[in-house]
């Protein structure tokens, strides 16, 4: 993570999960014998906040969920602040997102380690923009019924609860290498969309701000 985000620039998160997990890792590092523990602890402290001692890092992550709750509302979310509700609502409303993500990845300069270059994130069915989370492929796509009978109960991996369950199964359940690989690939696709969802929401906010600024001028 430290290498991926570099030394400058704004870091976004959505809600508390990332901040909570990083603070848990900080506690683990404090009790560890890792050679670079101090460097990693300093990095974590620079991008997180803590309630117990009111610490807030100089490069603290910006919570897009708080931005949404304080400055934006879309009735399509039906009152939910979840990223799973905000993303499809933003896609339905934003012309920029519709024009950009209706194109294959190869045409919009978006790289992916888990989807093909021809993959299109925005799909329309019966004139309705589809929820990208619901368009994620089934975990065990193209498996036979006989093979499926031997597997765990996870069929779709498109929400945080299913992702945590799948990760737990991989850690503590005796399963075939084939099933473990299928769950691993599904988790990677889900996590990639979770990350891209924050990019899309930020792009949607930016579009709204540009329109409002132009109207003021």
Predicted features along the sequence, with ranges:
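DEDD superfamily 3′-5′ metal-dependent exonuclease/proofreading module
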Residues: 1-217
